[in-house]
Amino acid sequence: MRNICIVVTARPSYARVKTLLNAIKKHPKLKLSLIVTGSALLDKYGSVINVIKKDGFEPTSIVHILIEGESLLTSAKSTGLGIIELSNTFHNLKPDIVISIADRYETMATAIASSYQNIPVAHIQGGEVTGSIDEKVRHSVTKLSDFHFVSNKDAADRIIKMGENKKNVYISGCPSIDLAKAIENKKVKKNIRLPLKGVGHDVVLDEPYLVVMQHPVTYEWDKAFDHINMTLSAIHELNIQTIWFWPNVDAGSDDSSRAIRIFRENKINNKIRFVKNLPPEEFLILLKSSLCLVGNSSVGIRECSYLGIPVVNIGTRQDGRKRGENVLDVTYDKKTIKNAIL
């Protein structure tokens, strides 16, 4: 049997590969080695590992690599620690191939640790342009990878121009669209039980609500506090029920979280519920029934495009990515954000 290793590092990476995990698990000639690492192990980012286990996937290895601090320095140090720890893990598991996702620093560690041991790497969602450190990581991982599964033709062409063998480049689309397709005709059900998850206002799911996902931008990480405050102010003044997901683990996320906590303490009478995480299908069903998605998550570019959900994309985090007509780009300005939502 071929030993296929998948590394899940965070909330979004699990959503990207859940259907792939199922396919490998069911295949009679494949063995799944599942490594869970990074923020997927931490309660402050929603304990993604618990969702993974509940879905029936038992991790083969759990690898702790994150250094606390959420700064540029700790991101670099976590990458180094990730290389050390994942190198040992790959050496012990001896996979035939390692599958890595997207463009985070954990992805860089995965690609280096496997390629230096002559273990082939398959990279999902390479070849895209965003202009931040993520793009540098993404293109570096492309050069460390042997097989490339990309979202669109532009990404495929870009990888081929980088010198990769076109026979090893596959336009597979975004794998999270598999999940979006599966929930396409489903509606929000009360069994999502949002009142028991997160803190803040109890959202009534059969009344209009917004969803917010806003993360710090790596080359603007020192402005994360101000960026979040601008969006918080806009949402608060709109006085519409809102489900707000905590930011990813990136440089600046501590400041983003601090801004949210200060707002939560000072603005008692608001209609926002802050949630760490939801299982992928529940999240997509929730999103599909919302008025729109606000923030700077790639979910707005990918899943929302497929599901036809309006998106107010704030700032530069998704600059360069292909997008549908459902996306409206705005700056970090309270009035502009409010007008775009309305």
Spans of features found by a protein language model:
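Nucleotide-activated sugar donor-binding and catalytic core shared by glycosyltransferases
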Residues: 1-342
